[in-house]
Amino acid sequence: MRCTTLIMVSFVVSCLLLSLVEESEAGAPPVECWSEILFSGKCGFHGKKKCYKEMESKLKQRVLKCRCEDVKKDSNTSKDEHYCGCQRENPYECN
């Protein structure tokens, strides 16, 4: 009886160890991929939607969420510009 119990316990422990090794070998998923591009014009009231459309057409990839930030004008810039920062859907295609 002891021998059978010992074999069963060692089998369970072996299975647990093997599953932990497989999980660690798979590696961590890639970190989020954010891209930021400068566009002409201001963000406006619907800046996030505007950035979403501009970034998808520019990157030719789906994006998950965006933020829009107007560039402050100084003496060197005469036109309105804004930065669009968006998170790409597929972090494996991050450049």
UniProtKB/Swiss-Prot annotation:
One Pfam family it belongs to: SCRL
Free-text tissue specificity from the UniProt record: Flower buds.
Origin superkingdom: Eukaryota
Keywords: Antimicrobial, Disulfide bond, Fungicide, Plant defense, Secreted, Signal
Signal peptide: 1-26
UniProt key word Signal: yes
Disulfide links within the chain: C33-C94, C43-C68, C51-C84, C66-C86
Keyword S-adenosyl-L-methionine: no
Family (UniProt): Belongs to the DEFL family.
The protein's name: Defensin-like protein 232
Species of the source: Arabidopsis thaliana
Native organism taxonomy: Eukaryota, Viridiplantae, Streptophyta, Embryophyta, Tracheophyta
